Amino acid sequence: QMPLINNLINLLSQLFSFIFIYVLTAYCDTNKLQWVAYIYSLSPIVTLLLFYPITFLIYKELMPSLKYVKFQYIRVLMNLGIKFFLIQLSCLLIYTTSNLIISKNISPEEVTPYNIAFRYFNIVFMFFSIIIAPMWNAVSDAYNRKEFNWIQKTMKYLQNLYFFVCIGVFIMVLMSQLVYKLWIGSSVVIPFSLTIMFAVYILILTYSSLYSNFLNGMNKLNLQLYVIIVMGILFVPMATILSQCMGIIGVALSLCIANLPCAVVNYVQYRKVINIKATGLWNK
């Protein structure tokens, strides 16, 4: 019930990584890549090791113990856990295979501008995720109480927020070349068309996550699962073909195409569920 703490853990992990890598680049001249791998691997572990004892001291009832294990709930929990696992696995397939496709079909050098543009716009999604993260538990509680008016009012607020996200992304596009120059200098050239493509991608992804977050709170996972698995399977051949035709722009376009059906389905399912018109697969 405290997503802020979870986000703080992730933030500190990233902060530790940044600090250690900065020190590494400033004071170390050998085996930098190897040490970067060590830092990325150890930072989350160190952060969790720092937080977990504190958590169990404050909330002793959360400390793991065999006496709290209830085997009769294993089937229900495993069913729900497997759904989330498959959704995350499909998302991982979509987001992590892009670099491999670019490296294989185009050139390893093209991975750099692709990743820079991706990370630039991904800042928007990170901040938006932090804002909507607390809604998951709140929506779950409201849905069980059948407080649909509260859910609709909250969604209206977040839809207004999404409008400002669109404005923010538009400003980021206008300022992109200046930001790239300040960030990485002039050593890497990032096509403006790639910037536009990632702006579209992040707007689609943010829009989709807005509704998927509410659907997760309502425990409506099946339709999301089916759509994301299909798109995860189609992404690799689609990105491969488009990369051969359009270069890295084609890979970014594939991300947009893969996320668009999810955004549309999530919106339609949310409308059906909140208006109590969902039947069959739309209600699962």
Predicted regions and their residues:
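Hydrophobic alpha-helical transmembrane segments
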Residues: 7-58, 231, 248-272
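Alpha-helical transmembrane segments of polytopic membrane transporters and translocases
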Residues: 39, 82-83, 98-100, 112-128, ...
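Signature of the first transmembrane helix
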Residues: 18, 79-109, 119, 231, ...
